[in-house]
């Protein structure tokens, strides 16, 4: 299922803002991390209706992905 592009962009913005606040990152860096994440690709491609999940859940998922990627480097 494909979400409305405008609503999806707003969801991306909310997730990025929450992620930046939780990780104490500048918004531009948080946005770059988000757009290079697996989470973004899944949401963009409409996999498993990820866009239907709550902002909090998706932000936590992004934090987990960020920390696992950070540790792998």
Task: For every predicted segment, state its role.
Residues 1-73:
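C-terminal alpha-helical interaction appendages
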């Amino acid at each position: 299922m494909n979400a409305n592009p405008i609503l999806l962009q707003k969801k991306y913005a909310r997730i990025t803002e929450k992620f930046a606040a939780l990780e104490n990152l500048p918004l531009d860096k948080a946005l770059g991390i988000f757009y290079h994440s697996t989470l973004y690709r899944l949401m963009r491609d409409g996999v498993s209706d990820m866009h239907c999940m709550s902002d909090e859940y998706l932000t936590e998922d992004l934090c987990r992905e960020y920390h696992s990627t950070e540790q792998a480097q």
